[in-house]
């Protein structure tokens, strides 16, 4: 999937998509704000949130210079929605990939469980960010309306028309294969390998460039992480932790869900959610077996907690760091205080919604 994303970026797909949507809303700031939030969430369902923010934030900065508005509110909203969108599917945020592959859940399982929670939460989050920033957005829209600007044509973003068409077809095929993999019997890993091979063949002489741009550090990190977690599992430490949660909750499933969800969210706000999720998987597995509760319920609580909790602080998720860095390069500093003032309440709201929806659906 990394190779596919690099191939799409190479031909200008992401910049074209952003510019196309901006043109559709006639470059008005408020509709643009809402559109980019929704776009961020949708793209993050299939593409890693770092890539989504890299391109969305860059285009946001470019449009802010044209339309004379402060890009910080839009970048913050995009970052949160990227993390939220990633929670909706198995191939979104890395914790979901780990949870899905370790516990045997499919793309459809995530889409019909965490995806429903993410979809409802997205509506609430859009309203939240609009209420928080509506005065600033309205002022920016009024200023933009008074200026005469020439806007770039979306087609200018396409660097290779033939490659653009091929990359779009490959992306659509990937989406179809991921959505239907439970029915076809194809594993997510097989689909990823197939898509990467097709992308490399389509890239031709640029195939080596795509291979060089793969994030090998992340891949090696995953390999090492699984080895460490396997070692912890063998020592029995994780079973002790599972028993501890079981003792605290006293076998009460409602309390178990709350503990897993909120501990995951709080921990992920300060530590990398990937190793945390990997560590928690055998814990919830042991907890499920010991307390005779449905493992999937605990898995959805873990997924939502780790995916959303990272949004609360600037260091909680990689997408946050990328968004802040992009804004800083353009001269817009986002300090801890400003970030947490906006993002922490949004995180609490979504984690609260997640808990209530899990209660309503499974208890």
List the model feature ranges, each with a label.
Residues 30-34, 78-89, 147-155, 218-232, ...:
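Small-residue-rich segments of transmembrane alpha-helices in multi-pass membrane proteins
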